[in-house]
């Protein structure tokens, strides 16, 4: 499956050139944003961890081994990219135990930067956002055109597609999900089941968003749309009055698309017509998600880019810094700028 099939059309027009992302881990840096005050006491030890070219699950296993606890005793808010330099929180459940020596978990790929006690464990999805520092190298694009495009993205956001990494190489996760859906069965392995259900829901959401990008309605509320605020999981129906809510214009409020599950879409009007049509095109996949017990949820169609800044450390390097809500993909921001080509190596440092 191609990127266009998995995501959909760009909203900003043709890419302005080409670049490399992730030539080295430092080119893709992620800092988890967690708005939880830690008490300094309790049976949970929270760890602020920096990892390089290491996925979250492997980091959790290493920390658990070093602490001498089962991996189920360690928690994290979300999964971060492997091919990156990331900083995120973990928590270890250590009732009645002293702080363990975690040095055995540390090497060039993992460092524990801070540890603090707290009364509660870290819950999945507890982080409010992720901060990104991206370095695009081997840049072949006009700076003036990039500056103008970036200014537009800052003002109007980008389509909130799920990024290609959600779907596996060539869309393999979607194809596997379709295979299981045709059999009306679920994988026995929990992690495989979770990955394929997530890929299927993400693919269907992208199909709806792609249609709305194509007709220009992805950032415009229509009567019958379900609207949501950037950081809220709740939503409400749009009537004539809601469609002119000034919070839409300042990127606080957005139309949403479906995260498929049990029951019909609660949307109405043109949104319901579109979502029903997409559901009929992928009936087996939708029924598979419903049978798996997934509940119908909503996701904003438009992704506001918080605190977007950029500069050029070298003529052929563009460095971007911005913040995105949890669960959103930095690569869909880059996609509106340039085409990415396979990674090579560069010697230019990342400037902060």
Swiss-Prot record:
Annotated catalysed reactions: uridine(13) in tRNA = pseudouridine(13) in tRNA
Entry annotation: catalytic residues: 81 (nucleophile)
Domain of life, source organism: Bacteria
Gene Ontology molecular functions: RNA binding; tRNA pseudouridine(13) synthase activity
Assigned keywords, A-Z: Isomerase, tRNA processing
Keyword Cell membrane: no
Any GO BP annotation: tRNA pseudouridine synthesis
Pfam families in the cross-refs: TruD
Domain TRUD: 157-303
One CC-aspect GO term: cytosol
Cross-referenced InterPro entries: PsdUridine_synth_cat_dom_sf, PsdUridine_synth_TruD, PsdUridine_synth_TruD_CS, PsdUridine_synth_TruD_insert, TruD_catalytic, TruD_insert_sf, TruD_pseudoU_synthase
Record-listed E.C. numbers: 5.4.99.27
Cross-referenced HAMAP family: TruD
Family under the similarity heading: Belongs to the pseudouridine synthase TruD family.
Known role: Responsible for synthesis of pseudouridine from uracil-13 in transfer RNAs.
Protein name, as recorded: tRNA pseudouridine synthase D
Organism of provenance: Pseudomonas putida (strain W619)
Taxonomic classification: Bacteria, Pseudomonadati, Pseudomonadota, Gammaproteobacteria, Pseudomonadales
Gene behind this protein: truD
């Amino acid at each position: 499956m191609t990127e266009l099939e998995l995501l959909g059309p760009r909203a900003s027009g043709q890419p302005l050139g080409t670049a490399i992302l992730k030539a080295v881990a430092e080119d893709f840096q992620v800092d988890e944003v967690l708005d939880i005050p830690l008490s300094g006491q309790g049976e949970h030890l929270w760890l602020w961890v920096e990892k390089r070219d290491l996925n979250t699950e492997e980091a959790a296993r290493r920390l658990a081994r070093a602490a001498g606890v089962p991996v189920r005793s360690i928690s994290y808010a979300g999964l971060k990219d492997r091919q990156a330099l990331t900083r995120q929180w973990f928590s270890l459940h250590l009732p009645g135990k002293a702080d363990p020596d975690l040095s055995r978990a540390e090497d060039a790929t993992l460092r524990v930067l801070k540890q603090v006690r707290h009364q509660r464990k870290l819950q999945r999805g507890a982080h409010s956002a992720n901060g990104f520092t991206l370095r695009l190298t081997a840049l072949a694009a006009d700076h003036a055109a990039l500056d103008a495009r970036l200014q537009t993205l800052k003002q109007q956001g980008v389509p909130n597609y799920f990024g290609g990494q959600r779907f596996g190489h060539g869309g393999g996760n979607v194809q596997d999900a379709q295979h299981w859906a045709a059999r009306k069965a679920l994988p026995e392995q929990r992690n495989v089941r979770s990955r394929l259900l997530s890929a299927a829901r993400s693919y269907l959401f992208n199909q709806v968003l792609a249609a709305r990008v194509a007709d220009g309605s992805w950032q415009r509320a229509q009567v019958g749309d379900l609207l949501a605020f950037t950081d809220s999981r709740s939503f409400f129906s749009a009537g004539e009055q809601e469609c002119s809510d000034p919070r839409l214009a300042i990127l606080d409020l957005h139309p949403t698309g479906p995260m498929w599950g049990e029951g019909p879409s609660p949307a109405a009007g043109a949104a319901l017509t579109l979502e029903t049509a997409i559901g009929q095109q992928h009936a087996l996949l939708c029924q598979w998600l419903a049978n798996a017990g997934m509940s119908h949820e909503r996701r904003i169609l438009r992704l506001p880019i918080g605190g977007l800044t950029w500069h050029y450390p070298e003529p052929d390097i563009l460095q971007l810094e911005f913040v995105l809500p949890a669960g959103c993909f930095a690569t869909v921001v880059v996609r509106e700028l340039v085409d990415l080509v396979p990674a090579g190596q560069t010697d230019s440092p990342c400037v902060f």
